[in-house]
């Protein structure tokens, strides 16, 4: 039996998520397969502005809108490493194609392009990522830790971070206040 891939899906933390790192988190899943899963938390700013990040990596950044943009806390794994989620996908040295139009890039060339004003149309930069070993995410979903729904790029790239969690919840089509964090069997 072939397992269902949740790549290009949102993971929505259930109300009552016990882990404070993931409480009220919205994760964009970039990869999901038999070896595990990885994604980026897309609604938690890291407290670092793009200008600070680019200063740290010695790249100029003159575009004021980009300078004031937020860098996100992508998750607890490799928190000192940058991950750039963007569309269109483009042609970068180290990219994971999530969809035909969305990629996750970890190579510095995409940051150099941002510095030079040649950035992808839409991007989200995070430090760190969220990762799950084989079967771990499936268990967390079965234990009512996460809700899943196909991702909408407009939520990732167009909405303010404060609105992303509720917008993803709205994709489910029901009132999240009706959810219980209690696990049980009917």
UniProtKB/Swiss-Prot annotation:
SUPFAM superfamilies: VC0467-like. It holds the Pfam family DUF179. One of its GO terms (cellular component) is cytosol. It comes from the Bacteria. Belongs to the UPF0301 (AlgH) family. This is UPF0301 protein CV_3909. The lineage of its organism: Bacteria, Pseudomonadati, Pseudomonadota, Betaproteobacteria, Neisseriales.
């Amino acid at each position: 039996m072939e397992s269902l891939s949740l790549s290009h899906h949102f993971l929505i933390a259930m109300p009552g998520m016990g882990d404070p790192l993931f409480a009220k988190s919205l994760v964009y899943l970039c990869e999901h397969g038999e070896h595990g899963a990885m994604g980026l938390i897309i609604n938690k700013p890291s407290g670092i502005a793009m200008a600070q990040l680019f200063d740290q990596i010695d790249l100029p950044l003159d575009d004021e809108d980009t300078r004031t943009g937020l860098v996100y806390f992508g998750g607890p794994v490799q928190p000192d490493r940058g991950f750039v989620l963007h569309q269109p996908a483009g042609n970068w040295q180290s990219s994971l194609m999530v969809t035909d139009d969305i990629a996750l890039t970890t190579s510095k060339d995409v940051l150099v392009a941002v510095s030079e004003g040649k950035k992808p149309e839409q991007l989200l930069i995070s430090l760190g990522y969220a990762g799950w070993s084989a079967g771990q995410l499936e268990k967390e979903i079965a234990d009512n830790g996460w809700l899943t729904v196909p991702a909408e790029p407009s939520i990732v790239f167009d909405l303010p971070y404060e609105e992303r969690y509720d917008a993803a919840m709205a994709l489910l089509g029901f009132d999240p206040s009706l959810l219980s964090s209690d696990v049980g069997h009917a």
